[in-house]
């Protein structure tokens, strides 16, 4: 399976990079993982609703340009469906079973995702009703994808 993570914003924190690199290495036994970092849109200090929409739309255009037409797109969004690790594993297994060899996870910037990106998404996934820093979400997502592969293979993984 080919897994892409399209994310807004450049990762700056060394500890996050190290964790992400570790999970990409672990996942290499199960899938090819590609992280596509896109620049965040510069925004004025006090954003109006219209300014927020413009920023999200510009970031959304960048995101959509990186999504393969045949990819199954999973947008990380607070309004998405919350799943257990086992449910995510089932979801990943179904994708592989039904011939979807490309899964693209999308992580928006600090303002979230544009309507166009949410519309393109085949599903919306939420990790919590809480908001997490978008840079940290990359690491959390990779850990859960790794856990999903381990579950699907019946391999041990700590709970």
Swiss-Prot record:
Binding of S-adenosyl-L-methionine occurs at 76, 108, 127-132
Name the source's superkingdom.
Bacteria
- Show the CDD domains listed in the entry: RlmH-like (cd18081)
Q: Which UniProt keywords apply?
A: Cytoplasm, Methyltransferase, rRNA processing, S-adenosyl-L-methionine, Transferase
Which EC number applies? 2.1.1.177
Q: What does this protein do?
A: Specifically methylates the pseudouridine at position 1915 (m3Psi1915) in 23S rRNA.
- Quaternary data: Homodimer.
Family, similarity comment: Belongs to the RNA methyltransferase RlmH family.
Q: What is this protein called?
A: Ribosomal RNA large subunit methyltransferase H
From which organism does this entry originate?
Bacillus licheniformis (strain ATCC 14580 / DSM 13 / JCM 2505 / CCUG 7422 / NBRC 12200 / NCIMB 9375 / NCTC 10341 / NRRL NRS-1264 / Gibson 46)
């Amino acid at each position: 399976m080919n897994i892409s993570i399209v994310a807004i914003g450049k990762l700056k924190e060394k500890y996050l990079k190290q964790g992400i690199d570790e999970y990409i290495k672990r996942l290499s036994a199960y899938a090819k993982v590609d992280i596509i970092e896109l620049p965040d849109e510069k925004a004025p200090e006090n954003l109006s609703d219209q300014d927020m929409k413009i920023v999200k739309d510009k970031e959304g255009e960048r995101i959509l340009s990186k999504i393969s037409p045949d990819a199954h797109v999973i947008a990380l969004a607070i309004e998405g469906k919350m799943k257990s690790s086992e449910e995510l594993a089932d979801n990943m297994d179904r994708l592989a079973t039904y011939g979807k060899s490309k899964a693209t996870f999308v992580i928006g910037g600090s303002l979230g995702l544009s309507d166009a990106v949410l519309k393109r998404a085949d599903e919306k996934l939420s990790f919590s009703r809480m908001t997490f820093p978008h840079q940290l979400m990359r690491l959390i997502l990779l850990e859960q994808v790794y856990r999903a592969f381990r579950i699907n293979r019946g391999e041990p993984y700590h709970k």
